[in-house]
Amino acid sequence: MALLPESIEMKNDVTGWRRYLHERPEILYDVHETAGFVAGKLKEFGCDEVVTGLGRTGVVGLIHGREGSNGPTVGLRADMDALPINEITGANWASRTPGKMHACGHDGHMAMLLGAARHLAKTRNFAGSVAVIFQPAEEGGAGGLAMVQDGMMERFGIERVFGMHNLPGLPVGQFAIKPGPITASTDEFAITVTGRGGHAAMPHLAVDPIVTGSAIVTALQTIASRNGNPLDSVVCSVTKFNGGFAHNVIPETIKLAGTVRTLTPHMRDLAEERLRQIATGIAASYGATADVNYQRSYPVTVNHPFETAIAGDSAALTAGEEQVDRAVDPMMGGEDFAYMLEARPGAFIFIGNGDSASLHHPAYDFNDEVIPYGISYWVNVAERALAA
């Protein structure tokens, strides 16, 4: 167990890259400056091939192993996009763009993978090839799917793929992983309840969509408590309830919206079915109607057992077995690396960000002390998965 000496030696350089990227956040697929910076570094490191424009604005650098060695290609993925949030960290390297910031640590993810790419391109101590993948639009744009659909796996012959995300609250130098589902599917719904408007003093002459909607909100919680197996997680959260315009008027319509998170395909199907039944059934019982718009987004992120073992062993080699939780509870957040794991076997791991603000918080900042651990982890994954 040990950090790679070079990961410590290059920490200042990599921290500089991270802070440069942090100052220049870009959203979804509009990551042209970010992608240009990444591609420039990969060329500077001597990658054998650097391809841009995959999945619209993604970048892939290909690094071949030692001369004369043959073997498969392993993909290592980092995300590039920021979030539409106003930063309040007050850091010297804070966002220069109002309304945009790296509030999920993708700046750190890129920097660590760039550091690993520099080391791998220099040492090439593996048999096969490493594809370092820099993906746009993780934050709601399904950039991972776009890169898969653009033929990335086939173009580079990728046989296994690995992803990593920082986790606030997990101490620096620790890792967390598990086989099977590790992050949830992320679905969204919108429900329009239509009743009959009227005077608030004469509700008997109206059909009140606010009362109807309130009953729907309450009943949706029975999906988790009464419809699903208690051991099969589901979250149904109503996060918007909009309606009405005056204190003495019962409105004609109200609108509800929210999210559903699940960890298995069966529960995902059941949750959607029950949400539709509950909304339309309760509306009908109140004399109203409910129009349900249900959109499926990212699928469940499912780690493959063999690759999970490679990832866990690589983390243990980096930080020590006692610093690796190999049975972490799944997270109910979503992650579009799921699409890459549907296309190829692989694994997704969490790396500790220490005592920082939570992800997507305006006070969040990536912890630069994590950088040597992330670089060392990526190098260990590549060298274990492609043992010479």
Task: Give names to the regions the model predicted.
Residues 65-68, 152-153, 354:
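Short polar/acidic secondary-structure junctions
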Residues 1-102, 107, 111-114, 118-126:
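Acidic/His- and Gly-rich active-site-bordering loop/insert found
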Residues 211-388:
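Metal-dependent amide/peptide-bond hydrolase catalytic core
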Residues 75-77, 189-191, 348-353:
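Non-cysteine beta-strand/loop elements that form the S-adenosyl-L-methionine
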Residues 21, 61, 76, 106, ...:
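Divalent metal-coordination and catalytic microenvironments
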Residues 59-60, 82-101, 107-108, 114, ...:
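Histidine/acidic-residue-rich, glycine-tolerant segments that coordinate divalent metal ions
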Residues 48, 158-159, 345:
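Conserved acidic residues
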